[in-house]
């Protein structure tokens, strides 16, 4: 895996991000990974976000994580989850303009707040073909958008998540079309400490299957 730091524009501000390129010669699928809530310490340095990106690269998928506006070295300030949707669109623009990316196979993974911000973009943007949600923090409008979206989806939660309990998610799961899998990891909480590799592998397998890739040896 090759890791590359970069900056990219979103309107009149610059955002920082990190590529995780797999060691492949042909164009690879790509997944944007959106981090949890910045007002509660969330950033692209989240151990769960990092584990997902590293595992995606092991599955021959390019991963891209970035800091939302106002986080780390990204310009701007917190936008209440609305302006951050523009950050996701800017990351998609960057991916589609980057050589070595298979533009027909682009996915998005959102963790908590990252899912709440990423879902409204992913369900509408034709460039995104697969969507994974980790402990998703969605508003009712986000669940409604998911209900109307036919793209393949994956959702995962921890049995000890008391912020967004899996029982709360189950009421939405039944109404979400093309939800390929809803997993609940026993013992894990909202922050996934000690379970990062497990959740990362589940997410990466979903994208690998959706992109018709073989598992790493």
Model-identified regions with their sequence ranges:
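N-terminal cap/lid segment of alpha/beta-hydrolase-fold proteins
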Residues: 1-26
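Short, surface-exposed "cap/lid" segments of acyl-processing enzymes
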Residues: 24-65
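Catalytic histidine-centered segment of alpha/beta-hydrolase-like enzymes
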Residues: 76, 188-200
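Alpha/beta-hydrolase active-site loop
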Residues: 79-99
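Alpha/beta-hydrolase fold nucleophile elbow
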Residues: 100-111
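Gly/Ala-rich beta-loop-alpha elbow adjacent to hydrolase catalytic centers
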Residues: 110-118
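Short beta-strand/loop motif that positions the catalytic acidic residue
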Residues: 149-150, 154-157, 161
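Acidic catalytic loop of the alpha/beta-hydrolase fold
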Residues: 159-164, 190-191
């Amino acid at each position: 895996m090759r890791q590359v730091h970069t900056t990219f524009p979103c309107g009149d501000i610059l955002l920082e991000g990190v590529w995780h390129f797999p060691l492949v010669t042909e164009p690879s699928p790509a997944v944007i990974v959106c981090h949890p809530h910045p007002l509660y310490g969330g950033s692209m340095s989240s151990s769960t976000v990092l584990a997902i990106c590293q595992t995606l690269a092991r599955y021959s998928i390019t991963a891209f994580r970035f800091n939302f506006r106002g986080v780390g070295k990204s310009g701007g300030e917190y936008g209440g989850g609305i302006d951050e949707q523009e950050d996701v669109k800017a990351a998609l623009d960057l991916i589609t303009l980057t050589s070595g990316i298979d533009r027909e196979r682009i996915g998005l993974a959102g963790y908590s707040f990252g899912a709440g911000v990423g879902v409204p973009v992913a369900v509408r943007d034709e460039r995104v073909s697969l969507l994974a949600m980790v402990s998703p923090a969605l508003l009712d409008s986000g669940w409604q958008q998911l209900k109307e979206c036919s793209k393949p989806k994956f959702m995962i939660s921890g049995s000890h998540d008391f912020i967004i309990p899996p029982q709360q998610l189950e009421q939405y799961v039944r109404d979400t079309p093309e939800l390929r899998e809803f997993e609940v990891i026993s013992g894990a909480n909202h922050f996934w400490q000690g379970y990062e590799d497990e959740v990362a592998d589940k997410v990466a397998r979903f994208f690998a299957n959706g992109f018709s890739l073989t598992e790493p040896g």
